[in-house]
Amino acid sequence: MKRKLTGLFGAPVSDRENSMTAGPRGPLLMQDIYFLEQMAHFDREVIPERRMHAKGSGAFGTFTVTNDITKYTCASIFAEVGKQTEMFARFSTVAGERGAGDAERDIRGFALKFYTDEGNWDLVGNNTPVFFFRDPKLFPSLNHVVKRNPKTNMKDPQANWDFWTLLPEALHQITILMTDRGIPKGFRNMHGFGSHTYSMYNDKGERFWVKFHHRTQQGIENYSAEEAEQVMAKDRDSSQRDLFNNIEQGNFPKWKMYIQVMTEEQARNHKDNPFDLTKVWYKDEYPLIEVGEFELNRNPENYFQDVEQAAFAPTNIVPGLDFSPDKMLQGRLFSYGDTQRYRLGVNHWQIPVNQPKGVGMENICPFSRDGHMRILDNNQGASTHYYPNSNGAFEDQPQYKKPALDIQGQAYEYDFREDDDNYFEQPGKLFRLLSSEEQQILFNNTANEMSPVTDALKHRHIRHCYKADPAYGQGVAEAMGIDINEVDLDVAD
């Protein structure tokens, strides 16, 4: 049975195709209210795109606990082996706009939202375990250099590489990005990482530092630079198509979740800053501990409703999980929620994909009121709108207080380079883990990506690579057609 057309407020529509005019060939009349309503809505259809991670794909699924980690955390989501929790995942490219090609060389976003029975837990990460820098003050500049030049409105490799090579700590991330892992074949075929150091605490109040790893069960598959060009020439939505079609066909992708755990005592004695996002924790020192598995098994019915309006923020945590002194994480605690309030409004938590389904909307009792689009909870009705109050309308839940975190030091803008200038050890170790064929691919990809930039930037990058491993610097120089003897390798970084 066909549905009968109405306007937004229920009035029947008599003619969807023909506007009201003064005579059959006369001008349009402004009293054609359906035309006005449709055009006014159309003019406002597009909401601001994300400043980063603009183009994404998403799916719903289920997380299942497969190993007991209750000695580390009292979070209910991990309470017992076999416990299941509904979830939503969003994958994305990072630098590109909404129309970006899925097979571009770029980091991939890997954001997870778990609808736990203690509230939503958002684990916001990428497909790499590290990042370009370790201070969030650099975030706006990173965005600017990977986006478009303000004069030409074109991508600007010179600005991009100038910024990256002025940050020697970026070499670790750059090295990963310039391997074939910089272009995953699809979202199903890549690992994910929480990247930041988070913390867990148990029912005894003991705190542990943790890193999250999500290992694909479909196997790692990547495109070469040449393959990626061919794919994008035919299909700019290749990763989204792959994810959507496989789920529709019942071929549900799965990932295993693991954690690395570091005690507070180990952190105090760790060689490097354990909260430095440009470095990893070595697995031989902090082995992977299995936590669970998640499966994505349902596509959204409407992309805009569930994927475009999905709002992730690392501030969405639950009892038993907490933050760390990681400065990048601390910066994201503000920025993520703030961008969602700008994109979607202060009441974006009422959008279905963002609702705390595991708790139930009827049990949500925030103290916030009003704001654009406050529609689902009667705006708390006539209940008391201040606290404390004499009628006992609300009460805290002190049993969920977090254990104390020992923080010491004087407030100051510390130069992190004076604290830790060990930029090149881990990129060097990563380079030596690559096969000779993979190393050559790294050289060639780097030379290709840097081909538009000046020799001064090439020399700077070669110097960083050389400091990580002489063979790394030599290989990049040869791929660029540069005599390494012409590069000043002794400049301090």
Swiss-Prot record:
Keywords on record: Heme, Hydrogen peroxide, Iron, Metal-binding, Oxidoreductase, Peroxidase
GO biological process: hydrogen peroxide catabolic process; response to hydrogen peroxide
EC number from the UniProt entry: 1.11.1.6
InterPro entries on file: Catalase, Catalase_3, Catalase_AS, Catalase_clade1/3, Catalase_core, Catalase_haem_BS, Catalase_immune_responsive, Catalase_sf
Annotated region (Disordered), positions in chain: 1-24
Gene3D superfamilies: Catalase core domain
Residues where heme binds: Y336
Cited Pfam families: Catalase, Catalase-rel
Molecular-function GO terms, alphabetical: catalase activity; heme binding; metal ion binding
GO cellular component: cytoplasm
Reactions listed under catalytic activity: 2 H2O2 = O2 + 2 H2O
PROSITE patterns for the chain: CATALASE_1 (PS00437), CATALASE_2 (PS00438), CATALASE_3 (PS51402)
Active site: H53, N126
Entry function: Decomposes hydrogen peroxide into water and oxygen; serves to protect cells from the toxic effects of hydrogen peroxide.
Family of the protein in this entry: Belongs to the catalase family.
PANTHER family named in the record: CATALASE
Assembly and binders: Homodimer.
Protein known as: Catalase A
Organism expressing this protein natively: Staphylococcus xylosus
Name of the gene encoding the protein in the UniProt record: katA
